[in-house]
Amino acid sequence: FQNEAKILKTVFGQFDGQNMVDEQGKIYPVPGNYASKSRLIEGDSLKLMILEDGTYFFKRVDLVQRIKFIGRVLDRDEHLVIKDKEGRQYRVLEETIRYFALQEGMEVAAETSEGGRWAAIVNVI
């Protein structure tokens, strides 16, 4: 690691759409820019390395099976969501919305997990 701080603790958990949740149910916030850039979806396995200076380093260690779909961006109660062809709606991270400059009506390629409530955007169509 760049700052040469030693690893104090390593924790494993699952991504819930916004956070990593470990086996005991403890929640660790995942930076939205990392989750968005890595296209994390619910169920992905993460490793968190906590350095002695308190710095968090997340690493994805396993991918959950992805369901790919084409959806349309909708504005719901001042939050953008992605609606698939079957009418299911998925939440999207704010960082993803900003990165892709998503607006209502845009068509996107996205992916989610079985039973997922969150989607990762792959591309704007």
Language-model segments: residues:
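Acidic (E/D-rich), amphipathic helical modules within compact regulatory domains
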Residues: F12-V64
